[in-house]
Curated annotation (Swiss-Prot):
Keyword Signal attributed: no
Role, per record: Protein component of the very low density lipoprotein (VLDL) of egg-laying females. Potent lipoprotein lipase inhibitor, preventing the loss of triglycerides from VLDL on their way from the liver to the growing oocytes.
Keyword NADP in annotation: no
One Gene Ontology biological process: lipid metabolic process
Protein name: Apovitellenin-1
A GO molecular-function descriptor: enzyme inhibitor activity
UniProt keyword terms in alphabetical order: Storage protein, VLDL
Quaternary structure and interacting proteins, as annotated: Monomer.
Family indicated by similarity: Belongs to the apovitellenin family.
A Gene Ontology term for the protein's cellular component: very-low-density lipoprotein particle
Length: 82
C-alpha cells in the first residue's frame, strides 16, 4: 500500500506502546518502581496532558488528511488532466 492509502492514525498508538514497554521492563526489575510509574501515570496532570495531546494530534491528523486529499485532487485534475 502507498502512504496515502494506509491508516494514518496508526502512529497515534506509538507513545502508548513506548510507555507500556518501559513500564513492563521496569516492573520486571522492580515491582515497587513499576507501581510508582503506574500511579504516576494516573495523576491528574499526566492524564490531562495525555488527553490534550491526543485531542490535538487528532485535529492535526484530520487536517493532514484533508490536505492530502486536496493535493491528490490537484494532482489528478491539474497534472494528469483527469
Amino acid at each position: 500500500k502507498s502512504i496515502f492509502e494506509r491508516d494514518r492514525r496508526d502512529w497515534l498508538v506509538i507513545p502508548d506502546a513506548i510507555a507500556a514497554y518501559i513500564y513492563e521492563t521496569v516492573n520486571k526489575m522492580s515491582p515497587r518502581v513499576g507501581q510508582f510509574l503506574a500511579d504516576a501515570a494516573q495523576t491528574p496532570v499526566v492524564v490531562g496532558t495525555r488527553t490534550f495531546l491526543i485531542r490535538e494530534t487528532s485535529k492535526l491528523t484530520l487536517l493532514a488528511e484533508q490536505l492530502m486529499e486536496k493535493i491528490k485532487n490537484l494532482w489528478y485534475t491539474k497534472v494528469l488532466g483527469y
